[in-house]
C-alpha cells in the first residue's frame, strides 16, 4: 500500500529534509554576527513567518526552536533562519543550536560550536552541523512558551495528480488528470487532520473517476521516540479507494547515513459515488520493511525493501534516488 498524500508534510520526508538542509548549508558567503540575547531574534523569525518560535539559554548553550511554514522548500526556509540567527548575533564563547519542528514534533537540530580562541565575527552556514540528535538543551526548550503557534491554523495545499495506464491495444495510454486541494489542521502536538477534495480535469478511467469526490480524509498522529526513532499512525480514507489504518516507523542509527523503516496497513476497499460511501467486507494486511543508506558525497539515497501487497503477494523493491537542491531523480 502506498499512501503518498497530503498528510506527508509538504512533500518532503524527514530524510530528504536533512539532506537538502545539509546541501544548502554549504552554499553561503560568510555573514557577520555579534552577541545579543535571543528575544530580538525570536521576534524577527516570527516576522519572517516561522511558527512555534522560542529560545532558551543556560551556561552550556543557546537553543532556538522554529517550525518552517514560510517557505515552500524546507531546506530553503531553514537556511533563511540560520542566516537571520547569524545576522542578529550568536552567543559569545558558547554553542548555539537550532531545533526544527514539524507539527510541534522535533525533527533535526543544527549546531554551531565556536572554536577556542576564535572570533565569531565571521560565521557561515558551513560552520553548522546537522543531526537528528537534539542535545541536552531540548529538555529545557520543550517546556518554553513559543510564539506564533501553529495549533488550529488551517493550511491550504493544492496537489496536481497525473495517472496513466496501458490496458487496451487501441490506445497507447489511458490518462487521468486531477487537481486536489486539501486543508491541513494541526490539532495538538503531532496530530493533524487532513481533508481533500478531488476535481477531475481529464479522465479515461471510467465513471467513478469523473465525479468530484473526497480524496484523503485522515487523522494522523506523529511521535518522536528515543534514539532518533519516528512513528506515525493514520486512520481514514486513503488513495486507491482504500480506507482503514496505517502505521509506519523509521529509525536512524548513530551513523545517520544508515536507517531502517517499517510499515503496516490494514485496509478495506471503499469509494464515494454521488457523495455516498460504499465499502466491501474484505480487509487486507499490507506492509514493508527495509534498510536505507545515504551517500553524502553524491547526495544519493539507496533503499532495499521487502513488501506485501494488496493481493497477498510478496516482493522486493530497490530504489536509488539522487537529490538536488530543488528536485530528486530516481
Give the positions of each predicted feature:
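Short, Lys/Arg-enriched N-terminal segments with co-localized hydrophobic residues
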Residues: 2-7
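Bacterial N-terminal signal peptides that target proteins for export
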Residues: 9-22
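Hydrophobic h-region of N-terminal signal peptides that target proteins for export
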Residues: 26-34
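Outer-membrane beta-barrel initiation region
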Residues: 36-218, 280
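Transmembrane beta-strand segments that form the barrel wall of outer-membrane beta-barrel proteins
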Residues: 65-68, 156-168, 193-201, 226-238, ...
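Outer-membrane beta-barrel translocator domains and adjoining extracellular loop/strand segments
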Residues: 170, 206-209, 244-248, 273-278, ...
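Short helix-loop boundary/capping segments
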Residues: 255, 275-277, 297-299
Amino acid at each position: 500500500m502506498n499512501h503518498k498524500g497530503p498528510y506527508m508534510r509538504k512533500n518532503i520526508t524527514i530524510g530528504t529534509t536533512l539532506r537538502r538542509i545539509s546541501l544548502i548549508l554549504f552554499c553561503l558567503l560568510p555573514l557577520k554576527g555579534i552577541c545579543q540575547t535571543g528575544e530580538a531574534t525570536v521576534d524577527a523569525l516570527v516576522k519572517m513567518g516561522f511558527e512555534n518560535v522560542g529560545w532558551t539559554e543556560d551556561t552550556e548553550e543557546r537553543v532556538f526552536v522554529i517550525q518552517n511554514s514560510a517557505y515552500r522548500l524546507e531546506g530553503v526556509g531553514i537556511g533563511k533562519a540560520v542566516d537571520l540567527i547569524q545576522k542578529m548575533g550568536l552567543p559569545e564563547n558558547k554553542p548555539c543550536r537550532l531545533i526544527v519542528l514539524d507539527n510541534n514534533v522535533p525533527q533535526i537540530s543544527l549546531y554551531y560550536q565556536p572554536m577556542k580562541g576564535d572570533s565569531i565575527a565571521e560565521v557561515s552556514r558551513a560552520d553548522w552541523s546537522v543531526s537528528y540528535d537534539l542535545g541536552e538543551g531540548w529538555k529545557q526548550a520543550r517546556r518554553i512558551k513559543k510564539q506564533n503557534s501553529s495549533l488550529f491554523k488551517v493550511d491550504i495545499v493544492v496537489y496536481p495528480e497525473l495517472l496513466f495506464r496501458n490496458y487496451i491495444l487501441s490506445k497507447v495510454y489511458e490518462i487521468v488528470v486531477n487537481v486536489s486541494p486539501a486543508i491541513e489542521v494541526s490539532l495538538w502536538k503531532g496530530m493533524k487532520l487532513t481533508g481533500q477534495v478531488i476535481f477531475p480535469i481529464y479522465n479515461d478511467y471510467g465513471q467513478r473517476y469523473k465525479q468530484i469526490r473526497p480524496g484523503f480524509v485522515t487523522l494522523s498522529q506523529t511521535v518522536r521516540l528515543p534514539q532518533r526513532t519516528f512513528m506515525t499512525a493514520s486512520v481514514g480514507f486513503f488513495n486507491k479507494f482504500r480506507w482503514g489504518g496505517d502505521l509506519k516507523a523509521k529509525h536512524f542509527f548513530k551513523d545517520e547515513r544508515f536507517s531502517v523503516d517499517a510499515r503496516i496497513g490494514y485496509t478495506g476497499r471503499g469509494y464515494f459515488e454521488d457523495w455516498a460511501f460504499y465499502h466491501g467486507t474484505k480487509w487486507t494486511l499490507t506492509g514493508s520493511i527495509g534498510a536505507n543508506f545515504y551517500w553524502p558525497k553524491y547526495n544519493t539515497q539507496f533503499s532495499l525493501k521487502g513488501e506485501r501487497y494488496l493481493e497477498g503477494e510478496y516482493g522486493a523493491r530497490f530504489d536509488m534516488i539522487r537529490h538536488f537542491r530543488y528536485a530528486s531523480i530516481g
